[in-house]
């Protein structure tokens, strides 16, 4: 079960936002339907890349034995 403030992992690429499968975000809101979430993705310095409405099929919980990985954010049009 995914809850507010959980760390989650993106299940597939979202090219329009420069996000790739495996990127890590934080759940900032859970909708009442239990399967839709607002997820914030940030840079290592804390700058918000995107806050997106995603379904339970777009994200998964981060597991205790997983480790974070760093990569450069791709340039995208229309995304600051």
Kindly give the residue locations of the regions a language model identified.
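Basic/aromatic-rich interaction segments and small domains that mediate binding to polyanionic partners
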Residues: 2-65
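Long, low-complexity intrinsically disordered regions
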Residues: 64-80
